[in-house]
């Protein structure tokens, strides 16, 4: 554990469970409802403090079990951390998914952190700070993941999730550094970037993969254009040249657009990758309280 790399400051976020107990306050006074803890890391890779948000399932405090970790890109308080960790929290209530640790990795300059460098003048003019995805990937590999694994009881099983540019980063990481995570969830990835260069390079990059077991979960909204063209190229590369150990799937979401697809698609992804069997036998007869038939003794008196 690279403890010397980090100056870690814990701060409470708003909403939820799995953190320190709330302090009593006078009646009628507002009190924060704590759902997670935040940490500030003094990153040497990014050369600035970086924020992580961590949600722990309630069972974390009840024993010594170890948990898989889901890393959520764009995982700041005002980004996607709350609604994705909320899916994990709901699953603990309903018992529908495996308990997870959810780590939100905040982004500051998305074009800088989530895209690869291009020399195309139109991209350079429109987004002059772009192109540092390699550095951000080093931040995850050398700082974020070691911090999480050193501080929390993790099982060693990891997943990364993102949407739009964050999903582009997920796909790039899967193709270029596949051993960094076990599971990759990319929702409406912006594969239009740099004229679909990453999708066009996919066949050659896949050919370099080993046979280790990994999962790639892809989804796209009803977007068309170069968004759809890019993911179609990636799908073609996977169909013809997926590594032996890879399980991959694709889910089109024709009823959604780029602004609405993330939350429902994320729920589908988590259900497929971490779902638990229902607590009842779906093939068994319905229990009596769900039956339409009422016994004669239950009929109202006349």
Go through each PLM region and give its residues.
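Non-catalytic cap/lid and distal C-terminal segments of serine-dependent acyl enzymes
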Residues: 23-302
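Positively charged n-region of N-terminal signal peptides that target proteins for export
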Residues: 1-4
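Bacterial N-terminal signal peptides
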Residues: 7-16
């Amino acid at each position: 554990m690279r403890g010397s790399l980090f100056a870690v400051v814990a701060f409470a976020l708003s909403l939820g469970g799995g953190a320190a107990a709330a302090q009593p306050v006078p009646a009628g006074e507002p009190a924060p409802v704590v759902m997670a803890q935040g940490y500030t890391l003094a990153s040497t890779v990014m050369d600035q403090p970086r924020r992580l948000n961590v949600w722990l399932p309630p069972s974390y405090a009840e024993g010594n079990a170890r948990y898989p970790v889901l890393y959520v890109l764009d995982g700041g308080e005002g980004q996607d951390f709350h609604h994705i960790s909320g899916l994990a929290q709901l699953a603990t209530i309903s018992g529908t998914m495996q308990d997870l640790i959810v780590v939100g990795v905040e982004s500051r300059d998305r074009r800088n952190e989530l895209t690869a460098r291009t020399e195309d003048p139109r991209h350079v003019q429109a987004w002059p700070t772009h192109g540092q995805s390699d550095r951000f990937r080093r931040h995850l590999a050398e700082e974020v993941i070691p911090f999480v694994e050193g501080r929390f009881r993790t099982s060693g099983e990891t997943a990364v999730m993102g949407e739009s540019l964050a999903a582009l980063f997920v796909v790039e990481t899967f193709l270029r550094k596949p051993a960094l995570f076990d599971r990759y969830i990319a929702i409406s990835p912006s594969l239009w970037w740099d004229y679909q260069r990453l999708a066009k390079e996919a066949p050659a990059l896949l050919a370099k993969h080993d046979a280790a077991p990994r999962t790639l979960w892809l989804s796209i909204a009803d977007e068309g254009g170069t968004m759809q063209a890019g993911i179609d190229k990636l799908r073609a590369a996977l169909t013809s040249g997926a590594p032996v150990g890879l399980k991959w799937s694709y889910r089109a979401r024709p009823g959604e657009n780029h602004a609405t697809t993330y939350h429902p698609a994320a729920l589908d992804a988590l259900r497929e990758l971490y779902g638990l069997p229902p607590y009842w036998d779906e093939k068994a007869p319905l229990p009596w309280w769900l039956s339409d038939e009422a016994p004669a003794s239950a009929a109202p008196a006349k």
